[in-house]
Regions:
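Aromatic- and acidic-residue-enriched carbohydrate-binding clefts of CAZyme catalytic domains
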Residues: 181, 271-305, 379-381
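Short, charged/polar micro-motifs that form catalytic or ligand-binding hotspots
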Residues: 134-138, 297, 301-312, 349-352, ...
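Active-site capping/gating regions of soluble enzymes
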Residues: 1-213, 217-220, 224, 237-261, ...
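Short, conserved phosphate-binding/catalytic loop or strand-edge motifs used
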Residues: 337-343
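Conserved, mostly hydrophobic/aromatic
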Residues: 230, 345, 415
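Active-site beta->alpha loop and helix N-cap motifs at the rims of alpha/beta catalytic domains
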Residues: 196-211, 225, 231-239, 285-297, ...
Length: 620
């Protein structure tokens, strides 16, 4: 048994209330196998059926534990017991297999060899490489049914799971158990938080999002969807573990390359042109210059040399990493569909607003290196969860970038894309003709807060109160921190909430005064301090608002995480409706779905009185 499965079982942490921590979706195969063999009550997911050359498959689950199994039925004969690992024959002639990650990888080949157009697994279809909405899973997996509903009703595929790895997801559970995860700086809270601060592993998320499509029957719609391994760090301190990152992300159908770790340690030579002449192939330089000129841009030679000297080391490492992603897929998967993946180049980490010339140079470099870029993410000056204040200026910025991207056959990735105005999204969609990606991961913890706040369920209300108090405590601690950045940001968060409620903002004479001012407000998910600190609650040991408790990968952290998976059906329905409503809003305003289709979807959402009714709208 793997170390992570042993850890989970020893501490009574089951998949039902802590999914996606282990790469496997079966922790105790012997018990599940015996239960199935002895005809004990095991749930058969009715919409999960799919076919391979070997026969017909169904997904089974012990809903008390969350342990899952595959059942293979063969018409008129016995199913092969060794098709996947650890198979067991039933008296009926069917065979069952544990839902391990290794079996999932083998099953992907069987499915795609039989039907290359299958939409059970994330894919890299041409349409997904042109237009998508990025749905981030910043703290739980509870958003999946809502995303599946929205895709089903709108008839479009999106990036149905998006996570920064290793920032948000655990890239290696053995490293986690050894207490050796690196940490991520969060300047606004004045501390570093361990990587994987959501608690789940990248393989677990990859596994879980596939099973979700089968449980709800979304795969019967035949709509392709993608999984984005976001902000894959290139170079710097990540060189030593890039092989582990590649292995963990093998089911991702969409990779975002983040050059910032290598850029942070790159010093540009005083004579950049001479450095480029000595270190960059002359033929490549000539190719890039010609390609940029073909796109209608004139380069400043000095600026070109400085940029090339700055980015060349990171691009060489990006090329090597890209080769590893391709090799890992070629080794494991047998079909072109199973091996394909999309690429996004994140250049919003480069200094300042991105110029069209910079975008053209970066795209030309990737093109010359044989890396097709499907999405490129320039810097537009967006702030997370805040509308862009000037639509005329925004249109001008996007038009300049789109002229370049269109020439290179790339779409624009809008990072920090959540919380913009309808007019902002309309501009994005109109200028690009829908050739865009909007990343919205900052939105979904907020929607969970709204869901719990509105729920009448006592347990949901208790979780909401604890969650809100957690953010209050962090805000007060931060407002009096010795760290200047932490103090500044905390006070901004507090005064924003107070001013929007018509209260005075001169409240920092003492912690007592600040607490009194905050406590005069009615608890609300609309307060900025709640919005900014909320994602840290999910893995805070004991739910404590203490820096040492954040991102806790011990049983205490995972027991806290289980509270979110225990919310009521009312809370889940509220959450699903909130998410689906937001996705419909995005799809309509960007032009990815017709207004009439979106209006029909909104009417359906408004009519749902229970979670089962919404879930029933997913399968064909």
């Amino acid at each position: 048994m793997s170390a992570i499965n042993t850890f989970l079982l020893q501490h009574n942490l089951c998949i039902a209330t802590n999914p996606c921590v282990s790469p496997d979706f079966c922790l105790a195969w012997a018990g599940l196998r015996a239960a199935i063999e002895n005809a004990q009550p095991i749930h058969v997911w009715p919409h999960s059926r799919f076919e391979t050359a070997a026969g017909s498959w169904m997904l089974l689950e012990d809903t008390a534990t969350g342990d899952c199994a595959w059942r293979l039925d063969v018409a008129g004969g016995e199913a092969p017991v060794d098709l996947l690992a650890a198979g067991a024959a039933l008296k009926t002639g069917a065979v069952i297999f544990p839902a391990t990650f290794a079996n999932l990888l083998r099953l992907k080949n069987l499915i795609q060899e039989h039907n290359p157009a299958s939409t059970i697994f994330p894919s890299a279809t041409a349409q997904l490489g042109r237009s998508t909405l990025g749905v981030g899973a910043r703290f739980t997996t509870l958003h999946w049914p809502a995303v599946e509903w929205a895709m089903a009703q709108l008839g479009i595929g999106v990036t149905a799971n998006q996570n920064s790895i290793p920032r948000e997801l655990v890239y290696d559970t053995d490293v986690m158990l050894a207490g050796k995860l690196d940490s991520v700086p969060f300047p606004f809270i004045g501390t570093n938080v361990p990587e994987g601060h959501q608690g789940q592993s990248v393989e677990g998320m990859s596994h879980g999002c596939v099973l979700s499509k089968l449980k709800t029957g979304f795969h019967t719609r035949g709509i392709a969807w993608s999984f984005n391994a976001d902000h894959q760090p290139i170079g710097g301190k990540f060189d030593s573990r890039e092989d582990a990152l590649v292995t963990g992300c093998v089911l991702a159908s969409y990779i975002t390359f983040d050059l910032s770790p290598e850029l942070a340690q790159t010093k540009v030579a005083d004579d950049a042109a001479a450095w480029c002449a000595a270190n960059v192939p002359a033929a490549l330089i000539a190719t890039v210059k010609a390609r940029v000129a073909q796109a209608g841009l004139t380069l400043n030679e000095a600026d070109f040399s400085k940029l090339l000297a700055y980015v060349w080391p990171s691009l060489q490492k990006m090329k090597a990493r890209d080769g590893k992603y391709a090799a890992a897929r070629a080794k494991l998967f047998t079909t072109d569909a199973g091996r394909a993946y999309l690429r996004e180049l994140s250049i919003d980490e480069l200094p300042g607003l991105t110029t069209p010339e910079t975008t053209a140079i970066m795209l030309a470099l990737c093109e010359a290196l044989g890396m097709k870029i499907h999405f490129v993410a320039p810097a537009f000056g967006f702030q997370k969860n805040m509308p862009y204040p000037d639509n005329v200026a925004l249109r001008g910025l996007i038009e300049k970038q789109w002229a370049v991207c269109k020439d290179f056959g790339a779409s624009i990735g809008f990072h920090s894309g959540s919380g913009k105005s309808a007019e902002n999204y309309q501009v994005m969609g109109e200028v690009t003709g829908g050739r865009l990606e909007i990343k919205t991961s900052g939105r979904y913890t907020y929607e969970m807060g709204r869901a719990l706040f509105a729920s009448k369920n006592p347990a949901d209300q208790a979780l909401w109160r604890d969650w809100y108090e957690f953010t209050v405590e962090l805000a007060i601690l931060g407002a009096y921190s010795a760290d200047a950045t932490e103090q500044k940001m905390a006070r901004i968060f507090v005064t924003d909430a107070l001013s929007k409620c018509g209260r005075g903002v001169d409240v920092f004479s003492s912690p007592t005064a600040t607490r009194s001012a905050i406590e005069s407000l009615a608890p609300s998910p609309e307060h900025m301090f709640w919005f900014e600190y909320n994602f840290l609650h999910v893995l805070a040991a004991g739910g404590r608002a203490e820096k040492a408790a954040l991102g806790d990968h011990t049983p205490a952290g995972y027991r806290q995480r289980a509270r979110f998976y225990a919310i009521s059906d009312e809370g889940r329905l509220n959450f699903a409706k909130n998410i689906a409503t937001y996705l419909v809003f995005l799809a309509q305003n960007t032009g990815l779905a017709p207004a009439a289709v979106c209006e029909t979807a909104r009417a359906k959402l408004a009519g749902y009185q229970n979670l089962a009714a919404l879930l029933a709208g997913i399968a064909r």
